């Protein structure tokens, strides 16, 4: 027998009252986006559950993709069969012969949405249980926590059988908590921060600062590949490339070395906030982890934050590096993050960055520059690319493959 569909049960959105259908519709769209790489699969959703109709697609691959989608509590692969007692009996026997191992217990759990079916739920449990005994005479029934719970659902159009329940990612459907701008470098921390924001329903757009010729096409492709890894949790992501060369050269020419990182981060924050405003975002998200580097002390965070009143979410701020690496490996971003391409935060990094920068000093050094003009030109020069779960291999991929 071949699975015909996957029955999907919702997570936390079940508590959302009047907004329930908005959450469900968003989850349906997210599932459709993530499963778009399987052209045969069709997704529907109603108030109680969603369904992914396989239409011949490989169940194992689709299930692996579904495990990543936030807002799903669990799901079950389902067999669709003819709605007749004899077909149900033979189907139940076939399934049990395939999955039963010596000593296992079972029960039948039936429900009907088609109340015109010839047997009610209790009668169906008894009839199908009897069919199992015919196929496996020594099998034991156990009503509480059996090894196999064979679920039977009689609907208007057909009957559906399932026995396996697979845990989903939980969380909230991406996009139900508003939009945030993720400051995405090529490092380990910021993709993890993006993942954790996605889990709480934030629709992220990735803002990446590029400083050619100091940063290479490989560094840009690396950031896009990290973004692509995040699409499997909620669908397509807008990747915003910011030209940052002029600003970094200006900072290096007009500010003391100890303040290079502080001023760089202040400009990044200003630009990200300006993009957020234009694109209707609510928050800025970054991968800062307290004390991990010089720009991530509390004093540095205060000096950098001073350029905006927008809330800054730091999902990994209290984690140590090993905790962050564990998550990066789990979400499959770690190997990309450690590729040897420098980002714009490292190319002009001073030997002795200031760990307790003063806001008044930062403002004094910025007074030597045309801050507003620099920000405006950077924002005017952004390039936006929609990153999808699947992308064709290009020349930069080939170059990277040759280098690694």
From Swiss-Prot:
GO molecular function, a single term: tRNA binding
Cited InterPro entries: Rossmann-like_a/b/a_fold, ThiI_AANH, ThiI_fer, ThiI_N, THUMP_dom, THUMP_ThiI, tRNA_STrfase, tRNA_sulfurtransferase_ThiI
Top EC group: transferase
Alphabetized UniProt keyword annotations: ATP-binding, Cytoplasm, Nucleotide-binding, RNA-binding, Thiamine biosynthesis, Transferase, tRNA-binding
Major place of residence: cytoplasm
SUPFAM superfamilies xref list: Adenine nucleotide alpha hydrolases-like (SSF52402), THUMP domain-like (SSF143437)
Residues annotated to bind ATP: 183-184, 208-209, 265, 287, 296
Source lineage: Bacteria, Bacillati, Bacillota, Bacilli, Lactobacillales
GO biological process, any: thiamine diphosphate biosynthetic process
Pathway: Cofactor biosynthesis; thiamine diphosphate biosynthesis
Domain THUMP: 60-165
Function, in words: Catalyzes the ATP-dependent transfer of a sulfur to tRNA to produce 4-thiouridine in position 8 of tRNAs, which functions as a near-UV photosensor. Also catalyzes the transfer of sulfur to the sulfur carrier protein ThiS, forming ThiS-thiocarboxylate. This is a step in the synthesis of thiazole, in the thiamine biosynthesis pathway. The sulfur is donated as persulfide by IscS.
Organism of derivation: Streptococcus pneumoniae serotype 2 (strain D39 / NCTC 7466)
Disulfide bonds: none
Record's catalysed reaction(s): [ThiI sulfur-carrier protein]-S-sulfanyl-L-cysteine + a uridine in tRNA + 2 reduced [2Fe-2S]-[ferredoxin] + ATP + H(+) = [ThiI sulfur-carrier protein]-L-cysteine + a 4-thiouridine in tRNA + 2 oxidized [2Fe-2S]-[ferredoxin] + AMP + diphosphate; [ThiS sulfur-carrier protein]-C-terminal Gly-Gly-AMP + S-sulfanyl-L-cysteinyl-[cysteine desulfurase] + AH2 = [ThiS sulfur-carrier protein]-C-terminal-Gly-aminoethanethioate + L-cysteinyl-[cysteine desulfurase] + A + AMP + 2 H(+)
Name the UniProt record assigns to this protein: Probable tRNA sulfurtransferase
EC assignment: 2.8.1.4
Record's subcellular location: Cytoplasm
Pfam families hit by this protein: ThiI (PF02568), ThiI_fer (PF22025), THUMP (PF02926)
Gene it is expressed from: thiI
HAMAP family to which the protein is assigned, alphabetical: ThiI (MF_00021)
One term under GO cellular component: cytosol
Family named by the database record: Belongs to the ThiI family.
């Amino acid at each position: 027998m071949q699975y015909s569909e996957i029955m999907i049960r919702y997570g936390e959105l079940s508590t959302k009252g009047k907004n329930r259908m908005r959450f469900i519709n968003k989850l349906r769209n997210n599932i459709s986006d993530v499963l778009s790489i399987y052209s045969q699969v069709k997704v529907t959703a109603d108030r109680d559950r969603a369904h992914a109709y396989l239409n011949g697609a490989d169940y194992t691959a689709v299930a692996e993709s579904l495990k990543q989608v936030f807002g799903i509590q669990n799901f079950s692969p389902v067999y669709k069969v003819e709605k007749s007692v004899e077909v149900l009996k033979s189907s139940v026997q076939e399934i049990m012969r395939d999955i039963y191992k010596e000593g296992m217990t079972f029960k039948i759990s039936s429900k009907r949405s088609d109340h015109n079916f010839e047997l009610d739920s209790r009668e169906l449990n008894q009839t199908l249980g009897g069919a199992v005994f015919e196929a496996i005479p020594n099998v034991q029934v156990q009503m509480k926590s059996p090894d196999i719970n064979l679920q039977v659902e009689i609907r208007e159009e057909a009957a559906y059988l399932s026995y396996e329940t697979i845990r989903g990612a939980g969380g909230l459907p991406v996009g139900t908590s508003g939009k945030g701008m993720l400051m995405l470098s090529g490092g380990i921390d910021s993709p993890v921060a993006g993942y954790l924001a996605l889990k709480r329903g934030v629709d992220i757009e990735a803002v990446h600062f590029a400083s050619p010729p100091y940063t290479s096409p490989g560094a840009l492709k690396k950031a896009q590949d990290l973004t692509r890894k995040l699409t499997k949790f909620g669908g397509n992501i807008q990747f915003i490339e910011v030209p940052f060369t002029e600003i970094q050269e200006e900072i290096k020419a007009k500010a003391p070395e100890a303040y290079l990182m502080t001023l760089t981060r202040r400009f990044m924050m200003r630009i990200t906030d300006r993009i957020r405003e234009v694109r209707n975002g609510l928050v800025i998200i970054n991968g800062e982890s307290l004390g991990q580097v010089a720009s991530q002390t509390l004093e540095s965070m205060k000096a950098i934050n001073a350029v905006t009143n927008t809330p800054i979410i730091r999902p990994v701020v209290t984690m140590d590096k090993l905790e962050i690496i564990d998550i990066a490996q789990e979400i499959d971003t770690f190997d990309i993050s450690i590729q040897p391409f420098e980002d714009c935060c490292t190319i002009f990094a001073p030997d002795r960055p200031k760990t307790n920068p003063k806001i008044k000093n930062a403002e004094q050094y910025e007074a030597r520059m045309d801050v507003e003009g620099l920000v405006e030109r950077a924002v005017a020069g952004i390039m936006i690319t929609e990153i999808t779960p699947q992308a064709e291999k290009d020349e930069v991929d080939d170059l990277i493959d040759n280098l690694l």
